[in-house]
Amino acid sequence: MLHFIGDSAKRINWQSYCDNGVTRVKEVSTILGAMGIAQKMGMELDDKALVTLVCSDKGDTYGIPANENVIEWSIDSRQVGTEDFVILYDLDVAPRWQIPKTSGTTIACLKARNLHLLKNMTLKDAKKPELIPVISMNDLRTNGASISKAISWERTAIDFLRDLHYGISREILDRYPFFVVLLEADGLIVRQQDTLTLYFIPSKAEGDSGSLENEELRNSVCTEIIRQIVSGKYDFTRVLPDTLSMQVLPCYEELEAPESWSILNEKYGRDRLEIIETAKRIVIHGEKEILNSVPSCKYGALQTVDRMEIESYRAIVNLMKKYAQDKDTRPLSLAVFGFPGSGKSFGIKQIAKTLGGFEIFVYNLSQFTSLRELEVAFQEIRDASIKGERLPLVFFDEFDSSFNGEPLGWLKTFLAPMQDGVFMEDGRERQIGRAVFVFAGGTSTSFQNFISQDQNLFRKAKGPDFVSRLKGYLNIQGPNPTSKEDKVYIIRRAMLLRSLIIRNAKQLLDSDMRVNIDENILYALLTTETYRHGSRSLEFFISMSPLLGEKKWSSSLLPPRSQMDIHVDAEEFMSKITILAMCKELAKISHEMYLEAELAKTPNKDLQAVTHWENLNETYKKSNIAQMQYHVERFNDFCIGIRQKSPNSEKFTFKDEDLLKLAMAEHERWCKERIADGWVYGEKRDNEKKIHPSLVPWEQLSEEEKQKDIDVILRIITLFDRIGLELYYK
């Protein structure tokens, strides 16, 4: 049974409607609070169990009238059974003394002023929770929690985990095995026993769908949460109207790098082969799969799923919005960094296009030879600012280039314009006016790279003074890996590749927007190590390939190697083209070697896999090919390359630690494959029932079983030798 106590309110609005061409208005009332939830859930109210505090109903106001000071919730606890739920709803109309205790489970929807009540509760050690708090993250912030908002879902989640360990959230929530924290109407964090789960709308930030200050919205969200709890379904993906994704949050103390933890990495960054398969689907079928599961942001034609880029873009957007609305007469100064061709100006321009009201100016400082040219640029900006039709958005490309032979020589010339909004013209000080300055790095690939230059040189060039005047910066990740730990660059590359194909080679798309591309070319485009000129090099492959009139991008339509080598390592790229075929050949040879060894041990061995490759079940063929491809991709993580065998080269030997890690990875791969195919653990192997005794963690394997995985890795050396290739440490 459900019991409802707490605040209720009637909100009266006037709604216009058309009656035979005549506009009329009618009174529409909405019941909020405890009674509103009971009404939404279709409950027949028991007056003895429901205490309703009637509120003002004037106009569109709600809340206890100021002259009433109701400080207690009351309920006859004798009416509440151990299996009952008490729904307590707080409209924050008055401070309270306590939360009533019952023998059932209380779901307490509390607001900021009464969160302190959660600190004083004494709980029994029972399997069924006595009290389930349902509160908002905003109210935790009001009570002093240091938790960011609307920067990224990851940042908010990690800040909350930190506060739950060390901050006010620990005092308020840590004792409760079950609680719900609302992230406006765009997400929620749920704790159930030892598991914390983030539910979120991938394409939005906290607050995009509306504020919980709107009590009608809060009532609707809380009603669905209560419905999921009392029904025992706990399907919190149904709480909000938009599609919700979910991510189990890590234990904060076990996080090695909280600032770089990302949902994209958690979902797709664990296994390189899985990343590649996901990237292939993005290029061929579109981004829907990934956009429905990981955080993203979109401004015009710009779309990203990279946490660092999302946080930077949103911070820049907030700065530009605020500047557009305020009255500051000095320019807003921003900086953007990235590898050549990473799209530094593209992102900012798309943001400006989305926000509207900007006029774009571009100046390349590396092409300026005198201060006079910069003065002319400032005058053009000043004229546009005085005109006032649109706000000047000014790109100073390669601002970190040398001037008059002095490294970073341009920096000091911008100090006065950035600080005071003035420049010198013919010896006179002139006002620049309102503008947004965007300094795009030419030699510095990141902000950290820019400020970590030779410090004597940096100070001499007034670098610290320049940095102190910046209001924000943006690091563009681009299509190349930014570090050894960057595993999901292939996802970024796939999204860029699809957008470039749609823009420059529409004929490759069928009626379902499916890209027709040879799997070998796609694999090479996604996995080649580096594009020498970033996204421009990727675009080159499309523009220089003879695709006009072609419906499919096949290997015969690639650019000449001489042109290709300008943008990638052509030899490496072409070797990638053959990897899939190579893996099939390696899988075939591997199976025949395995067959030969097994039959030598037991000539009449009765196993499904003991048959020649041509007669082998397709499931086993795919498994063997996937195994080869998996290890070829894993070699990248260990700086192991593949090349044509040389007559004078020494025999390759794995480092001991690499051999162990690769063997452990092979066992993990095999377990995942078997589990996905429906196999389960059992002490005795049974192929028909799909039972296998080796479906256990590596540490629980016998030495004999471990050696089998080690032998799989060692056999790879022989396999490559048979096809005229060899492994080597790069």
Name each model feature, range by range:
Residues 358, 433, 447-480:
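A short helix-turn-beta junction within AAA+ P-loop NTPase domains corresponding to the substrate/partner-engaging
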Residues 569-730:
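Alpha-helical propensity feature that highlights long, continuous alpha-helices across diverse contexts
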Residues 328-346:
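Walker A/P-loop nucleotide-binding motif
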Residues 529-546:
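The conserved phosphate-sensing helix
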Residues 347, 351:
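Hydrophobic positions on the alpha1 helix immediately C-terminal to the Walker A/P-loop
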Residues 359-389:
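Short glycine-rich substrate-engagement loop in P-loop NTPases that contacts/grips substrate
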